[in-house]
Amino acid sequence: MVKIRLTRVGAKNKPAYRIVAMDSREPRDGKHLEILGFYDPKTDPATIQLKEERILYWLSQGAQPTDTVLSILKRYGVWDKFLAMKKSAKSSA
């Protein structure tokens, strides 16, 4: 199963994270399929960059976001766009 999750990057005690699509059986920092964004919680406010179009693609292909990534997607409205896209596809079918 493909998951959208965080992989840790950055120096010791200065974590930053990449938002990636990867197989759920891979280790946290293992081989990823695609980089979908970046999250730096240490800045004030936290720095977040998202490739919205690619995230929507992976969600439409059945990728499951982790709880942390889901909260980020909800905060930036990507999850709502996915639900609307899913609902419109269901009603037109």
From Swiss-Prot:
What's one Pfam family here? Answer: Ribosomal_S16
Show the Gene3D superfamilies listed in the entry. Answer: 3.30.1320.10
| Keyword Nucleotide-binding annotated | no
Q: Name one GO cellular component term.
A: cytoplasm
Name its GO BP terms in alphabetical order.
translation
GO MF annotations for this entry?
Answer: structural constituent of ribosome
Q: Which UniProt keywords apply?
A: Ribonucleoprotein, Ribosomal protein
Q: Which NCBIfam families match?
A: S16
Family, per entry: Belongs to the bacterial ribosomal protein bS16 family.
HAMAP family membership: Ribosomal_bS16
PANTHER family found in the cross-reference section: 30S RIBOSOMAL PROTEIN S16, SMALL RIBOSOMAL SUBUNIT PROTEIN BS16M
| Protein name, entry field | Small ribosomal subunit protein bS16
Which organism does this record belong to? Answer: Dictyoglomus turgidum (strain DSM 6724 / Z-1310)
| Lineage per the UniProt record | Bacteria, Pseudomonadati, Dictyoglomota, Dictyoglomia, Dictyoglomales
